[in-house]
């Protein structure tokens, strides 16, 4: 085995062992099986990268299969959103499948199991079924309908299929072992009546298969060789195999279920119920709110597919659930955007600065490098004039030696422009600074080659020409929760940890070239972070989302 094909995790070791034991490489087939009842999140992204990554490594197909067995919660809009997310991550499935494609075959197999006395119709209430199943420390007991005749079971099951009965009258259960130490093996439900229209099959079916019955059989129909699930499905593996035993042809590939750990990201929640609560209570503005770790939210915030894939690759595949610091994801985002994003200047909290010795009415076009990491990006022209905007925090009337920005009597360089010295400021009646006065060194123009231009000063500030400034709306997004694990506190609801400062909206002043940016395009606001053009942008107002700061601002907070 060459180094390129050497296993990098225990999942690949499983596959390599199977290949050594006689499984043909051509028989490898994988799948990603989401339920279309919500939007995918960062945890799903890791599973997508795992399965499609295996397909790429071994050069074998990966199916996208929708586990659409619950018409009460599933919608076509989720199917479309999930397909878009997978494509955006850079993957292409081999076959698009739906569990609903197999409803007839699953039904036929269930009928055969009834005939083989391995399934029966139970007419108990859900409460009665739960009670007679026992507990982890107490074995279950046989229910009163467990030994119904085959003929009666067939008639009842057909009646369920034809809509003869209500939702709570009957269920079909597998006949396994009510004393099993694995409660999932205590005659699990295979079918229930659901009087709801299905997003694909309409009103054709009145009964719908349960997940455990559908999953393994769908894998078998598609001839999936390896079915990878998260750790909560480990107890389900015994049932997965038992159901396969009822239908498998030994001449065909028998799917193998194996489990890996969830990779949770700090300061987030991924439970669909909790994400739904955030949306419904107006904490966020929809499923694609840039504070959400849904794939659509991350995409809108300005995350790149490369950053998410590199993140997934870097944390690997584990056997124990773990919490990954959000900073690790942000590291890969910064690393990608540092190379991909052009630099621009935008002042988030502007205060006017007047260069008193610069000629009134004079304007210049200065050269500014688009990306110092990539010389091929070239330069752009940035207008300069007597009045400019700088960040309010970049000026203090009096400052100590550790303040390397602008203060009275001290010099700083304006990025791509001149060295200036602060002379004083004008304040309003409340004592707020409304205008700064400075002088410039006419010979210090950046790139001019003069001795003055090569003078070293400790601070460099970004700025925007006041007469050319483009007002823009900037949404300063931060982490949605104030603690790393908001949903693990046993005494407090996760909503109590919502960060009240997760969004601040400001009107900023941007250099005029930014008006040509397209929705979804990400740039670096120099010294401030990476920002993405939001879909709320209109012809009259550009809107930017803060994708990520230039450095981790939470490192000290979480210590």
Residue ranges of model-derived segments:
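Residue-level signal for inorganic ion chemistry
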Residues: 22, 51, 82, 113, ...
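Conserved short loop/turn motifs at secondary-structure junctions
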Residues: 33-36, 65-73, 95-104, 127, ...
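Secondary-structure transition/capping motifs at alpha-helix termini
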Residues: 21-25, 53-61, 85-95, 116, ...
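N-terminal catalytic cores of NTP/NDP-binding nucleotidyl/phosphoryl-transfer enzymes
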Residues: 6-16, 20-83, 199-230
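A glycine-rich helix N-cap at a beta->alpha junction
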Residues: 78-103, 109-112, 117-120
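Core subunits and conserved enzymes of cellular information-processing
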Residues: 233, 237, 241-243, 309, ...
């Amino acid at each position: 085995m060459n180094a390129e094909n050497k296993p990098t995790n225990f999942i690949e070791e499983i596959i390599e062992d199977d290949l050594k034991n006689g499984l043909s490489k051509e028989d490898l087939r994988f799948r990603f099986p989401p339920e279309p009842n919500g939007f995918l999140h960062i945890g799903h992204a890791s599973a997508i990268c795992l399965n499609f990554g295996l397909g790429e490594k071994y050069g074998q197909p990966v199916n996208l299969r929708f586990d659409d067995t619950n018409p009460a919660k599933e919608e076509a809009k989720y199917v479309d959103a999930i397909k878009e997310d997978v494509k955006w991550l850079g993957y292409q499935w081999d076959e698009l499948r739906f569990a609903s494609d197999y409803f007839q075959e699953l039904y036929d197999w269930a009928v055969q199991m009834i005939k083989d006395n391995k399934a029966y119709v139970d007419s108990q209430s859900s409460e009665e079924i739960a009670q007679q199943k026992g507990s982890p420390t107490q074995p279950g007991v046989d229910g009163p309908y467990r030994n119904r005749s085959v003929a009666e079971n067939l008639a009842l099951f057909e009646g369920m299929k034809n809509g003869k009965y209500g939702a709570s009258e009957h269920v079909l259960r597998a006949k396994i072992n009510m004393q099993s130490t694995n409660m999932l093996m205590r005659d699990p439900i295979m079918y229930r009546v659901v009087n709801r229209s299905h997003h694909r099959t309409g009103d054709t079916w009145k009964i719908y298969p349960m997940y455990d019955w559908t999953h393994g059989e769908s894998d078998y129909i598609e001839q999936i060789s390896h079915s990878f699930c998260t750790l909560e499905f480990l107890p389900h593996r015994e049932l997965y195999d038992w159901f396969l035993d009822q239908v498998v042809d030994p001449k065909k590939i028998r799917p193998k279920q194996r489990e890996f750990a969830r990779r949770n990201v700090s300061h987030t929640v991924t439970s669909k119920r909790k994400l739904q609560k955030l949306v419904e209570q107006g904490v966020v503005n929809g499923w694609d709110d840039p504070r959400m770790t849904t794939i659509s939210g991350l995409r809108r915030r300005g995350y790149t597919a490369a950053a998410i894939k590199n993140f997934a690759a870097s944390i690997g595949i584990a056997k124990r659930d773990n919490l990954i610091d959000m900073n690790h994801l942000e590291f890969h985002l910064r690393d990608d955007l540092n190379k991909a994003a052009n630099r621009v200047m935008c002042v988030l909290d502007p205060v006017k600065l007047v260069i008193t010795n610069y000629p009134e009415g004079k304007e210049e076009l200065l050269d500014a490098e688009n990306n110092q990491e990539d010389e091929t990006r070239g330069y752009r022209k940035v207008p300069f004039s007597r009045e400019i905007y700088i960040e309010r925090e970049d000026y203090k009337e009096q400052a100590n030696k550790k303040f390397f920005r602008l203060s009275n009597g001290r010099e700083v360089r304006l990025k791509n422009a001149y060295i200036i010295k602060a002379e004083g400021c004008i304040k309003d009646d409340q004592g707020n600074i409304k205008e700064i006065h400075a002088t410039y060194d006419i010979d210090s123009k950046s790139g001019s080659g003069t001795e003055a231009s090569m003078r070293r000063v400790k601070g460099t500030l970004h700025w925007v020409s006041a007469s050319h400034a483009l007002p823009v709306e900037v949404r300063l997004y931060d982490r949605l929760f104030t603690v790393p694990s908001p949903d693990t506190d046993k005494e407090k609801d996760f909503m109590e940890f919502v960060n009240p400062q997760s969004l601040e909206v400001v009107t900023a002043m941007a250099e005029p070239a930014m008006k040509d940016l397209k929705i979804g395009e990400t740039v670096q606001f120099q010294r401030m972070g990476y920002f993405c053009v939001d879909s709320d942008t209109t012809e009259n107002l550009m809107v930017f989302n803060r994708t990520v700061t230039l450095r981790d601002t939470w490192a000290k907070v979480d210590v």
